[in-house]
Amino acid sequence: MFTSIPSLDSVLQCLLPAFTQPSFQTHIEVLLGWVMCLSRRTEYGVFQTIQAGTPVSRKERHPFDRFYNFFSRSAWTVHDLAHQVAVAVVVRLNPRGLLYLVVDDTLLHKRGKHVYGLGWFRDAVASTAKRVATASGNHWVVVGLAICIPGTSKIYCLPIHAMLHRAGKNHKSEAMLAKEMLGDILEWFPDRKLVFLGDGAYSTKN
């Protein structure tokens, strides 16, 4: 089992309110396993890294049940985790003044009939001015906080909220998901003024 360094541990402790104590411990193990994984970072590969000292057959899934259940059954939500991440980032890096938020979407390439939320979406990286490329994957709408790192002139955009965009007319559009996340952030920081930036895809009447 890996042990986090003190500087990382202080960051992880900020996220504790989003978890129960058991799920928080599993969260730490999964995060450290992801950081230390030298192979392809699939769930199985990360879980193997966590238990690197214990050989596990690919036919035996039960040693990793606790880690698989962390994502499907544990008592935590992406919304609550995003809240704690946002608070930690704002308090430490943007405690006063305007909050500059940037929204965009990204495609995480995935295949497989068991992958949740899978769909075919425009691949912005592979597309050109004359050709629109599509690819299979999970399509995420992400809101980041643009900040100037103290002591430098560099501006970075740190993700603080994200929602999965599902393909099809029966699911919410990217703009609607962005609107919901903006509403969340307004609730989290009711005393702050926000500047919300996005491209034409997020310019809608609703």
Predicted regions, residues:
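Conserved, well-structured functional cores that handle cations and Mg-NTP chemistry
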Residues: 1-206
